[in-house]
């Protein structure tokens, strides 16, 4: 006691009494923590003050980590055309390791953008197109040959008349092809070939 400087008041003497008697709830004091600005209930003669203060300071640090993480996410997405509205979620967020597990969290929920299909458009290759164009005349000639054979069986004069009309229509089409190419452009396969117009139509021999 002699080492203490200054007069000793009765209130100071009561603080050094051994805690033998039962603790009275009326002796509950509120000590202010000037560092964090919080009020912590403590009991004189108890060692729970340090653990209580440590737990509250740890929880306060967790709150600060949560707020800093959310603000950093909003700053990253600012100016990118993303909605920065905080939407409350019922479930804890994935990055809530340093936050309370029994609190209410808000996390930025981005709008789901429609997924664009990057699959290439299926187009017909040039080889298959040429093959199909070459197969059309063969099919037409085969059908015409079958029709001509049936006409020959029915009568010679009818077959000759039908063949004459078909050949005249074909020659007329050959004359009109150059004009049609300028009005209606078609595939390069047809344009590369120079089509010479037929100047005179030779008369068909009558048998």
UniProtKB/Swiss-Prot annotation:
User: Which branch of life, at top level?
Assistant: Viruses
- Please state where this protein is localized: Virion
InterPro entries recorded: Corona_nucI, N2-like_embe-CoV
Chief localization: virion
What keywords would UniProt list here?
A: Virion
- Cellular compartments per GO CC: virion component
A Pfam short name: Corona_I
Question: Is Secreted included in the keywords of this UniProt record?
Answer: no
More info: The gene encoding this protein is included within the N gene (alternative ORF).
The entry sums up its family as follows: Belongs to the coronavirus I protein family.
According to its UniProt entry, what is the function of this protein?
Answer: Structural protein that is not essential for the viral replication either in tissue culture or in its natural host.
What is this protein called in UniProt? Answer: Protein I
Q: Which organism is it from?
A: Bovine coronavirus (strain 98TXSF-110-ENT)
């Amino acid at each position: 006691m002699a080492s203490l400087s200054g007069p000793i008041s009765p209130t100071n003497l009561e603080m050094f009494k051994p805690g033998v008697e039962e603790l009275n709830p009326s002796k509950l004091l509120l000590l202010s923590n000037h560092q964090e600005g919080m009020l912590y209930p403590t009991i004189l003669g108890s060692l729970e003050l340090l653990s209580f203060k440590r737990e509250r300071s740890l929880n306060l640090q967790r709150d600060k980590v949560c707020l800093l993480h959310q603000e950093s996410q909003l700053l990253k997405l600012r100016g990118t055309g993303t909605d920065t509205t905080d939407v409350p979620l019922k479930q804890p967020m994935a990055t809530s390791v340093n936050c309370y597990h029994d609190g209410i969290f808000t996390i930025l929920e981005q709008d789901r953008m429609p997924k664009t299909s990057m699959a290439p458009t299926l187009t017909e290759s040039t080889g298959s197109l040429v093959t199909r164009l070459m197969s059309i005349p063969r099919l037409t000639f085969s059908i015409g040959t079958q029709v001509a054979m049936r006409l020959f069986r029915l009568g010679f004069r009818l077959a000759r008349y039908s063949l004459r009309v078909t050949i005249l229509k074909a020659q007329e089409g050959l004359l009109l092809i150059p004009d049609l190419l300028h009005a209606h452009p078609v595939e390069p396969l047809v344009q590369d070939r120079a089509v010479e117009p037929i100047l005179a139509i030779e008369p068909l021999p009558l048998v």
